[in-house]
Amino acid sequence: MTPDERHEVWKKLENEYQPFINYDENDTPFHSMGGAWMKKDHIFTTPFYYIDYCLSQICALELWDESNADIKSALEKYNTLCQLGGSDTFLNLIKKSGIESPFNVDVIKSLAFKCSSFLNL
């Protein structure tokens, strides 16, 4: 993706999710052309910042899905994860808790279909 393409995507996202933002093209031409995403310094300084949200969300959706079938089992997994705290790596913690890896494509596909069905999409 070129820088110009990234700027266009950012402009579209801002228009959709933050329509109240109105850049003055004379005062902030860089931002009005879609460059505001570059103000998010953690994109550059902590590149896994946003990925962490995605991984956590997939694990949370796994627990949500399991809770629909067996709330007790889902709560046990969640409690185990909480008790383990930061005692190990992320992948080892979720494995010890009985949660599938969010890197598993089959897990992502399955959750996508289940969420889509739940939302009647």
Language-model region placement:
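C-terminal, non-catalytic "cap/extension" segments appended to globular domains
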Residues: 1-121
